[in-house]
Amino acid sequence: MDMTWFEQMEARIPKGEVRTRFAPSPTGYMHVGNLRTALYTWLIARHSGGKFILRIEDTDQERLVEGAVDVIYRTMAECGLDHDEGPDVGGPVGPYVQTERRELYGKYADLLIEKGHAYRCFCEKQEETEGFEKVADPCRFLSREESDAKASAGQPYVVRQKIPGEGSTTFHDEIFGDITVENSTLDDQVLIKRDGLPTYNFANVIDDHLMGITHVVRGSEYLSSSPKYNLLYEGFGWEIPAYVHCSPVMRDAHNKMSKRHGDPSYEDLIAQGYLTDAVVNYVALLGWSPGGEREIFSMQELAEIFDINGISKSPAIFDIEKLKYFNAEYIRAMSPEAFAKAAEPFIRQAVKKPEISAAAIAALLQQRTEVLTDIPEKLDFFDELPEYDTALYIHKKSKTDEAGSLEMLRAMLPVFEGISDWCDENILAAMTGMAEKCECKNAKVMWPVRIAAAGKAVTPGGAVEICRILGKDETLRRMRVGIEKLEKSLG
């Protein structure tokens, strides 16, 4: 076999730097486990000043979902996971889409056959290797001449890895340490399918080597395949990359997160009102500990402190309440302008009157919001005064009852009518002035005014802010409605 082409491929491989890759299959939305893999892969590269590569693994054509590649690009961009090489930006070792590399895999399969570590299987059986007994396959023992003759005659075949029949294989993982597996427990997995496309297990080994990948980050479910990967690397005479197998993200102590069971993808979390920065920060800590008590980190800070040794062997449990805590912290840390922009679509779900300022409402909400989707239900009183029971005017702490509230609303109505500049300062002065005049606490004035204005006991903001946002005319109208309700209730 002429080795010139293989030598040229070897010469292209970048050397002397950390190179990591995120290699998703475009089969749908980005679930939390995939996002964590992408994040850890990015952090390893950025921490060391290396390169982060995006590769699209589309060899499983039956599972491909239209538009899923765009979802990958969009999600990574939103999360700040910029890649140095990939299908959209190019690079020295492209193409970066597996189906565009199809010819490569066949050549490397032939090379592996030449080296005695793979063989053509012409048997009419399923390509899946589960339950496949290598010792029972006559094709494993065909001479090279017999195999070549069958292939030249057009007889269809798959290429299988020739696992040693005896001995054991030991591989090292950065998290789990050294793991030894008896070769007798490994099957002769398919490397090239009958359609000429490679299997995932073969393609990713070839691509990782040719792209100079130094660290392979993936889920711990691939630990069982790693001995076969090692044997492939050894069969070619290649250096084995560092393996980083991450334990799964669980929905509870017994079940992995699954879209099938309704667990949220990244896109679902954003639609549910979580901020991207909060999601990424939380996902970083799902199975990795930075040490110390601090939990809130920027992407740059994560890249500076990230250490593979902090990744846990134990599965991480996805806790939505903990994510809410992170989200609330990020919301509180936003600039008022940034929060107003993020909150406005949710505010406008409930407040459709254009004269009511979304920015003014956002200012009330920022310190009181955990998740953006909670916003609409807090604001249902702005467009229309809801029906409410006059029992809301009874409040022990404010020392108010229906009769006292009626008296206070009647007293405040002309005072509010006399305000020419309807602003927080003047509205507050009017109510505190009334409290002084009545020799009572401010709450005894503000409670009935707020109930009349909002028709709810729990509101974002107090009486002053709500009255100011509603405007003078609407506030006075609602106070008159409150007076009428109380008069009817009291007979």
Language-model features: where?
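N-terminal Rossmann-like or analogous alpha/beta NTP/dinucleotide-binding catalytic cores
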Residues: 1-133, 226-238
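Non-catalytic terminal extensions that flank enzyme cores
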Residues: 1-29, 49-52, 166, 244, ...
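Glycine-rich phosphate/pyrophosphate-binding loops
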Residues: 46-60, 202-215, 236-250, 459-465, ...
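Active-site cores that bind ATP or allylic diphosphates and position pyrophosphate for catalysis
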Residues: 111, 119-245, 251-257, 265, ...
